[in-house]
Swiss-Prot record:
It comes from Chlorobium luteolum (strain DSM 273 / BCRC 81028 / 2530) (Pelodictyon luteolum). May play a role in DNA repair. It seems to be involved in an RecBC-independent recombinational process of DNA repair. It may act with RecF and RecO. A zinc finger (C4-type) spans 58-75. Belongs to the RecR family. GO terms for molecular function: DNA binding; zinc ion binding. Pfam families: RecR_C, RecR_HhH, Toprim_4. The lineage of its organism: Bacteria, Pseudomonadati, Chlorobiota, Chlorobiia, Chlorobiales. GO terms for biological process: DNA recombination; DNA repair. This is Recombination protein RecR. It comes from the Bacteria. Residues 83-181 form the Toprim domain. Gene3D superfamilies: 3.40.1360.10, 6.10.250.240, RecR Domain 1. InterPro entries: DNA_Rcmb_RecR (IPR000093), Rcmb_RecR (IPR023627), TOPRIM_dom (IPR006171), TOPRIM_RecR (IPR034137). The keyword Nucleus does not apply. Keywords: DNA damage, DNA recombination, DNA repair, Metal-binding, Zinc, Zinc-finger.
């Protein structure tokens, strides 16, 4: 069933393109927007445009940050342990570790994992930028790289590739401990489990 309004259908179609949003949920969201005052709709529209205009990837760690705050607040913080870099798949994983309050090192966001079936190779994610941080021109002083990728086949493949790439550079390569279910995503793991996984990391 389609609505007689092409504008409503266009909005439903736009919402249904979001990850995890089916057609039924998209209809519900469209109806919600329609019932809100114009001011609320304008606020939503401004927020969407603003995030596209202002948010960039940090020039150091590749996490998301505002254009006027680059490098990001984590990279520039004097309270972080600059000898450890935790490698994650996406910005939401950074938030997951930050919520635990236990990890005080730096991060590097790959923005994906190696997945040959999807046509994603090492050059398609932010591996080159990670290696640049370990070069003489990079941050310097890094002694440990923590691999904290999602426990999927693609995550394991990427971890293996990175460990083989990083070990010859003279840094210790570790991996967060098991205890996280295979196939799970880090953003949905509770803080206690994530903290234990980080604390129990082991060499690879």
């Amino acid at each position: 069933m389609q609505y007689s309004s092409s504008s409503i259908e266009a909005l439903i179609d736009a919402f249904s393109r979001l990850p995890g949003v089916g057609r039924k949920t998209a209809r519900r969201l469209a109806m919600y927007v329609l019932q809100q005052p114009r001011l609320e709709a304008e606020r939503l529209a401004r927020a969407l445009i603003d995030v596209k205009d202002r948010v960039i990837r940090c020039s150091v760690c590749q996490n998301v940050t505002d254009r006027e705050e680059d490098p990001c607040s984590i990279c520039t913080s004097q309270g972080r342990d600059r000898t450890v870099i935790c490698v994650v798949e996406s910005p939401v994983d950074v938030l997951a570790f930050e919520k635990t309050g236990h990890y005080r090192g730096l991060y590097h966001v790959l923005h994906g994992v190696i997945s040959p079936l999807d046509g994603v190779g090492p050059d398609d994610i932010k591996i080159r930028e990670l290696l640049g941080r370990l070069s003489p021109e990079g941050i310097g002083g890094v002694r440990e790289i923590v691999l904290a990728l999602n426990p999927t086949i693609e995550g394991e493949t990427t971890s293996l590739y990175l460990s083989r790439l990083l070990k010859p550079l003279g840094v210790e390569v570790t991996k967060i401990a098991r205890g996280i279910p295979v196939g799970a995503e880090l953003e949905f793991i509770d803080e206690a489990t994530l903290s234990r996984a980080m604390e129990g990391r082991s060499a690879v």
